[in-house]
Every structure is written in structure tokens, then in C-alpha cells.
């Protein structure tokens, strides 16, 4: 970490500024961490993990970040099931019948 980059403690986690964004680390020394671009979203993500809530309408990367930061097995299983459900669903593609294909 370079000199002058900030570090903040929030609800049992450390938010450290890196060159490309922020790193959230569990304060207990276990080494669990994840990387996020925005400091405000870091705090929201920590709130979700501490309160055991599943973040709405987020990418699989964010859900996996919640798994990395949490130590609650029920919470981890709930998010893992959501990720698996998303992977099993097929993406519905739009087909324009009037467009000519060559």
C-alpha cells in the first residue's frame, strides 16, 4: 500500500484505498477480503453482510464478495443458491423477425 492512501474502520471491517479502488478486509486477521471500486458501495456491502441481507439487483461478483466477507454459514448458503439459480437460467435473446440476416 502506498503512503498517503487512506484506511477506515467500519462495523468490524477495514476499508483500505488501493490504486484502483478499495479493498474491504475483515478486521479479525483472517485475511478475507474483496475489491470494490466505490467507497460508498463498500459501506453498503458491509451493511448487507453484517445484517445478513442479500443485496438486490447486483452482479454475481458482488454476491461472491458477500460470500468472501461473511462467516455466517446460513447467509453463505442463501447467496450460493441465488448464484446457482442465476447460472441455471438461460438468457432470453431478442429476435427481430424483420431484420435481414446475411
Residue ranges: model-predicted function:
Residues 26-45, 49:
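A short, exposed loop/beta-hairpin motif centered on an aromatic-Gly-Thr core
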Residues 39-43, 59-63, 72-81:
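Short amphipathic alpha-helical segments that mediate assembly, nucleic-acid/protein binding
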Residues 48-59:
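Short arginine-rich
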Residues 101-102:
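Intrinsically disordered, low-complexity mixed-charge
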Amino acid at each position: 500500500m502506498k503512503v498517503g492512501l487512506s484506511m477506515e474502520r467500519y462495523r468490524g471491517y477495514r476499508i483500505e484505498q488501493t490504486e484502483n479502488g478499495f479493498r474491504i478486509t475483515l478486521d479479525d486477521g483472517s485475511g478475507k477480503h474483496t475489491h470494490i471500486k466505490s467507497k460508498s458501495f463498500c459501506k453498503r456491502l458491509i451493511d448487507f453482510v453484517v445484517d445478513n441481507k442479500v443485496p438486490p439487483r447486483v452482479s454475481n461478483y458482488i454476491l461472491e464478495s458477500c460470500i468472501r466477507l461473511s462467516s455466517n454459514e446460513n447467509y453463505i448458503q442463501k447467496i450460493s443458491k441465488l448464484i446457482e439459480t442465476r447460472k441455471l437460467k438461460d438468457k432470453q435473446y431478442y429476435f427481430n423477425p424483420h431484420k435481414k440476416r446475411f
